[in-house]
């Protein structure tokens, strides 16, 4: 079955995605740029 592989990919990608968002927001905060949201 593919489910163990799929769940492993999801469990691996979710923390990386969240960490990436935090790092991006932190770097933008450090540079003092106005976020274009």
From Swiss-Prot:
InterPro entries cross-referenced by the UniProt entry: Cyt_6/f_cplx_su5, Cyt_6/f_cplx_su5_sf
Domain of life: Eukaryota
Pfam families: PetG (PF02529)
Gene Ontology annotations of biological process type: cytochrome complex assembly; photosynthesis
Protein name: Cytochrome b6-f complex subunit 5
Coiled coil regions in record: none
GO molecular function: electron transporter, transferring electrons within cytochrome b6/f complex of photosystem II activity
Membrane topology: Single-pass membrane protein
GO cellular component term of the entry, any: cytochrome b6f complex
UniProt keyword NAD, yes or no: no
Subunit structure: The 4 large subunits of the cytochrome b6-f complex are cytochrome b6, subunit IV (17 kDa polypeptide, PetD), cytochrome f and the Rieske protein, while the 4 small subunits are PetG, PetL, PetM and PetN. The complex functions as a dimer.
Keywords: Chloroplast, Electron transport, Membrane, Photosynthesis, Plastid, Thylakoid, Transmembrane, Transmembrane helix, Transport
UniProt record similarity statement: Belongs to the PetG family.
Subcellular location: Plastid, Chloroplast thylakoid membrane
General function of this protein: Component of the cytochrome b6-f complex, which mediates electron transfer between photosystem II (PSII) and photosystem I (PSI), cyclic electron flow around PSI, and state transitions. PetG is required for either the stability or assembly of the cytochrome b6-f complex.
Transmembrane annotation, as ranges: 5-25
């Amino acid at each position: 079955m593919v489910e163990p592989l799929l769940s492993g990919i999801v469990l691996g990608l979710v923390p990386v995605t969240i960490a990436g968002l935090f790092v991006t927001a932190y770097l933008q905060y450090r540079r003092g740029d106005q976020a274009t949201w």
